[in-house]
Amino acid sequence: MFHLRTCAAKLRPLTASQTVKTFSQNRPAAARTFQQIRCYSAPVAAEPFLSGTSSNYVEEMYCAWLENPKSVHKSWDIFFRNTNAGAPPGTAYQSPLPLSRGSLAAVAHAQSLVEAQPNVDKLVEDHLAVQSLIRAYQIRGHHVAQLDPLGILDADLDSSVPADIISSTDKLGFYGLDESDLDKVFHLPTTTFIGGQESALPLREIIRRLEMAYCQHIGVEFMFINDLEQCQWIRQKFETPGIMQFTNEEKRTLLARLVRSTRFEEFLQRKWSSEKRFGLEGCEVLIPALKTIIDKSSENGVDYVIMGMPHRGRLNVLANVIRKELEQIFCQFDSKLEAADEGSGDVKYHLGMYHRRINRVTDRNITLSLVANPSHLEAADPVVMGKTKAEQFYCGDTEGKKVMSILLHGDAAFAGQGIVYETFHLSDLPSYTTHGTVHVVVNNQIGFTTDPRMARSSPYPTDVARVVNAPIFHVNSDDPEAVMYVCKVAAEWRSTFHKDVVVDLVCYRRNGHNEMDEPMFTQPLMYKQIRKQKPVLQKYAELLVSQGVVNQPEYEEEISKYDKICEEAFARSKDEKILHIKHWLDSPWPGFFTLDGQPRSMSCPSTGLTEDILTHIGNVASSVPVENFTIHGGLSRILKTRGEMVKNRTVDWALAEYMAFGSLLKEGIHIRLSGQDVERGTFSHRHHVLHDQNVDKRTCIPMNHLWPNQAPYTVCNSSLSEYGVLGFELGFAMASPNALVLWEAQFGDFHNTAQCIIDQFICPGQAKWVRQNGIVLLLPHGMEGMGPEHSSARPERFLQMCNDDPDVLPDLKEANFDINQLYDCNWVVVNCSTPGNFFHVLRRQILLPFRKPLIIFTPKSLLRHPEARSSFDEMLPGTHFQRVIPEDGPAAQNPENVKRLLFCTGKVYYDLTRERKARDMVGQVAITRIEQLSPFPFDLLLKEVQKYPSAELAWCQEEHKNQGYYDYVKPRLRTTISRAKPVWYAGRDPAAAPATGNKKTHLTELQRLLDTAFDLDIFKNFS
């Protein structure tokens, strides 16, 4: 860590030509012009002080002189008057030379202005020293701010920065100043606001004001921001004398909020002392901090705030910020109550909430949503961002003025979790920005038992925010008024600039990680200090009593009033008989379900379309709907091929997707497709965004030109992130059931970078939080000799997490069996072998009366496979998604002659049919495709097995035996046939890697599995 004083040597003050655009201290911008000063435009070698940073300072002086010549030193007045009179470079502070031959009058005039030979160099150096001093405070002052309420550590972990960085003579000497200069008056640059209405101050007062602005209980990190207007805005907020003032009414409100925050935790501790609740003790100021951000944002027009936070203090936020009924919170502590809703539920400090109420400060309606989250710290960050983006989209809030997000973090997780970085880098991307998030870090200076010095390599836990130029406000949480001021500024920053901002609440944790944990094992000295520490409520109450803002009886009455509220709610909680998880829903869908949360029907209409619609979409997909738009020659051939397919009434994979999307847009369903390179498609098959070859950045999205009143289509290339982007899209899909939200992995192999979102949100989300989600994952999958990282979407992992029982045969005679299966499952897993079926499953996702995540293993080689085509006939009215595609060749005509029935899924079907034809076994081997793997199509497969009574059964897959679908399909297929026959395996041997990287080995393995599949004697020895 550099010392504050050493940084000044590297400073380069901002030039006046830059500052003219922004804040000046009550100086008219119109007067600030530099056209007449010759030292600004002429070569500067002749003026020894007009070089480097000196020239910048001279411009500052010139600005001041233009407004008021008496505001600068007399020597400067002479210099500028001489220069304006036309003195050549190098002579403005001496007797001026003749301007031209014969111009004696001009010479006489210029010479009369020179009254003295000032020591200009010394004067400039002194003023530059003061300017460097001011800038040093602005850059490094936060390092010596009094941030730690315990007084143990500097919040930035750097104990080597001396607290008396300026006041001693040797420190002043670094700047070329000494104690004799302390009472000298110096003109202030336009890059500071410490002067208020004054343009010059004594050095002693300059230092005092800088200390007050930057070295007390607030530390401001902002000088890395590369926007001058934003820097000036922040300087004005923190440097202006007396700006941090609160009315008595505001102080009383702050005290009341602290009472609620503190007494809530104390009440829980009294009633349930042995329960984990991850209390807020040590950072009780978080509650008034959040309420201040919400109040200020509401005042600025925000009417919907979406929040995400970890477990620490969550119950307090639910109770005192979102205003969840206290009895509902207290019920969660009753171990005797049973859950009324299906699913596992979740612990109380993970639950979300949605509530609409009146903001009492602004008297405006505001909706607050706290997103449910797992214990995986920071995982909810992109989810909150995605939900915020969706809510902004649906209400037409293109600038983020109505809907905003607040994210809470712990210090250790904020520094340690990579998803924080991924989320920050979404913050300013056009298709992902939420126009500014307020981040609040509960910096209790410990991560469970880990010291901050072992938890991060950076000075602050917030340093990650610097990558997006977000200002960072560090504040001592034991100074509630400083916290409130910082939160007001943060809300104003977001409202003004629509960019991220970070509030770092430097606090402590009074108890262990949870209430049952003993922190003295690992932090004995820290906790000895904490035991002595007065609670912030007591400190602030004593301060207000001493100021006469409140008296002791009023304070005690506030406490007793809230205690009574808690006791009454506790009594009501005893009347509750069951726990309702649905009371904790964070994203309700009004009107989609019945009042009791059930689907309005248990059926799905046909997903087919009329030929007119198919043809119209196909024609648009094969053309450029914009005039004077030049596309690439290769793309012209692709569009021509599409047009020929439409004429022939067939579709390939890309065209089937186009038709599914286009038809849903016609029905008012917004579609959002996101992922790496999805606009073109990793395999150059999609081309949903056309690029003009002659005009840079000119693009066209034909999908948005289909129908007059269609829903908008959003297709957006994402950043190179899986975890963050999938979380974002999951959050987007939470907001409304009437949108098809898809995330496509570049290759299915890369989805495991987002495994946390899949495991903690998508798979169990409904079971834990009674929250449905219709997100679609497109995962390119197929063994094609491309190596172990470009072959497998790991279907075995998705199938292993399906919630059906492989050993129980459901009631196949149940009405709407297939729809009931879908309703009961936790997600749907499909592997389509035809474009038509892909078309149907996308449309079914929206036409179902409920929402489930959809996992689709999409093809790669089939995108251009000549046999992977579907006729319009497969997509017309009356057609549906086929869960199973049965054999329809000669084997199906004479089923009694079939020796083997092969079950498979996906691309391997085309390898099998080719091999079967080559071996002339089309009548002996039947091939049935399972298109929907989960929920398992027991009913249809039973019919297939019964159709071929003499056939032995085998499962064929191109994946290795310990991967793919075999371990999922075999027990369910055995259950289907009551274990009457064995189910043999034809496929690759077990392996650690998903695929070989050697092409020859790949082909050898493929031929071996085909030999196994069609050798009718191979399983006889195992019988």
Curated annotation (Swiss-Prot):
Crosslink site(s) for Glycyl lysine isopeptide (Lys-Gly) (interchain with G-Cter in ubiquitin)? Answer: K534
Supply any other comment.
Answer: The mitochondrial 2-oxoglutarate and 2-oxoadipate dehydrogenase complexes (OGDHC and OADHC, respectively) share their E2 (DLST) and E3 (dihydrolipoyl dehydrogenase or DLD) components, but the E1 component is specific to each complex (E1o and E1a (DHTK1), respectively).
Cofactor(s) needed for function: thiamine diphosphate; Mg(2+)
PTM N6-acetyllysine: list the residues.
K401, K970
Q: How does it assemble?
A: Homodimer. The 2-oxoglutarate dehydrogenase complex is composed of OGDH (2-oxoglutarate dehydrogenase; E1), DLST (dihydrolipoamide succinyltransferase; E2), DLD (dihydrolipoamide dehydrogenase; E3) and the assembly factor KGD4. It contains multiple copies of the three enzymatic components (E1, E2 and E3). In the nucleus, the 2-oxoglutarate dehydrogenase complex associates with KAT2A. Interacts with ABHD11; this interaction maintains the functional lipoylation of the 2-oxoglutarate dehydrogenase complex.
Q: NCBIfam families this protein is in?
A: 2oxo_dh_E1 (TIGR00239), PRK09404.1 (NF006914), PRK12270.1 (NF008907)
Which residues does the annotation say bind thiamine diphosphate? R312, D411, N444, I446, Q676
What is any one of the record's Gene Ontology cellular component terms? mitochondrial matrix
- First-tier enzyme category under EC: oxidoreductase
Q: What GO molecular function terms would the record report?
A: metal ion binding; oxoglutarate dehydrogenase (succinyl-transferring) activity; thiamine pyrophosphate binding
**Which SMART domains has this protein been placed in?**
Transket_pyr (SM00861)
Per UniProt, the keywords (alphabetical) are: Acetylation, Calcium, Glycolysis, Isopeptide bond, Magnesium, Metal-binding, Mitochondrion, Nucleus, Oxidoreductase, Phosphoprotein, Thiamine pyrophosphate, Transit peptide, Ubl conjugation
Its GO biological process annotations read: 2-oxoglutarate metabolic process; generation of precursor metabolites and energy; glycolytic process; succinyl-CoA metabolic process; tricarboxylic acid cycle
Major localisation? mitochondrion
Q: What is this protein called?
A: 2-oxoglutarate dehydrogenase complex component E1
Activity regulation (record text)? Calcium ions and ADP stimulate, whereas ATP and NADH reduce catalytic activity.
User: According to its UniProt record, which reaction does this protein catalyse?
Assistant: N(6)-[(R)-lipoyl]-L-lysyl-[protein] + 2-oxoglutarate + H(+) = N(6)-[(R)-S(8)-succinyldihydrolipoyl]-L-lysyl-[protein] + CO2
Q: Where is the transit peptide?
A: 1-40
| Gene3D superfamilies linked | 3.40.50.12470, 3.40.50.970, Multifunctional 2-oxoglutarate metabolism enzyme, C-terminal domain, TPP helical domain
The record's InterPro entries line, in alphabetical order, gives: 2-oxogl_dehyd_N (IPR032106), 2oxoglutarate_DH_E1 (IPR011603), DH_E1 (IPR001017), KGD_C_sf (IPR042179), ODO-1/KGD_C (IPR031717), THDP-binding (IPR029061), Transketolase-like_Pyr-bd (IPR005475)
The entry marks the following residues as binding Mg(2+), namely D411, N444, I446
The modified positions for Phosphoserine read S100
Which family does the similarity line name?
Belongs to the alpha-ketoglutarate dehydrogenase family.
